[in-house]
Swiss-Prot record:
Primary residence: membrane
Organism of this sequence: Baumannia cicadellinicola subsp. Homalodisca coagulata
Signal peptide bounds: none
Keyword field: ATP synthesis, Cell membrane, CF(1), Hydrogen ion transport, Ion transport, Membrane, Transport
Functional description taken from the UniProt entry: Produces ATP from ADP in the presence of a proton gradient across the membrane.
Gene that this polypeptide is encoded by: atpC
Homology family: Belongs to the ATPase epsilon chain family.
GO cellular component, one term: proton-transporting ATP synthase complex
A single MF term (Gene Ontology): ATP binding
Annotated protein name in UniProt: ATP synthase epsilon chain
């Protein structure tokens, strides 16, 4: 008998976003993309702002935006702890576009209130949200 699924928890500072059996997930760690399948080697790593791509036990694909956080892989349990996590279908495209434009403007016109690093992080978060929205539209 082979194990085909494991339990995934995605938790933000505000609430639990996802809890269920999945076949696999894909997420971006600090050293690159990670594909987590059943019986993956235990792992604890930081994850970058971006998306979690997951396939549920019934084959359904879902996308979750995360602002960064921690990924913990145990034998049959994977946990994502994120500062912010939003299901893809709950993202607001106009708001994400405005955030992107504001971040680009902040990078162009740096002042004492915001560093280049802060502005770059905000831009990365906005681009990640837009990527999730684009993937969801493409899947429909």
């Amino acid at each position: 008998m082979t194990i085909k699924t494991y339990h995934l928890y995605v938790v933000s500072a505000e609430k639990q976003i996802f809890s269920g059996l999945v076949e696999k997930i894909q997420v971006t760690g600090i050293e690159g993309d990670l594909g987590i399948f059943p019986r993956h080697t235990p792992l604890l790593t930081q994850i970058k702002p971006g998306l979690i791509y997951l396939v549920t036990e019934d084959g359904k694909t879902e996308y979750i935006y995360i602002s960064g956080g921690i990924l913990e892989v145990q034998l049959n349990i994977v946990t994502v702890l994120a500062d912010t996590a939003i299901r893809g279908e709950d993202l607001d495209e106009k708001r994400a576009i405005n955030s992107k434009l504001q971040a680009q403007e902040n990078i162009k016109n740096l002042n004492y209130d915001m560093s280049y690093t802060q502005a770059s992080v905000e831009l990365a978060k906005a681009l990640a949200k837009l990527r999730v929205i684009k993937l969801i539209k493409k899947a429909i």
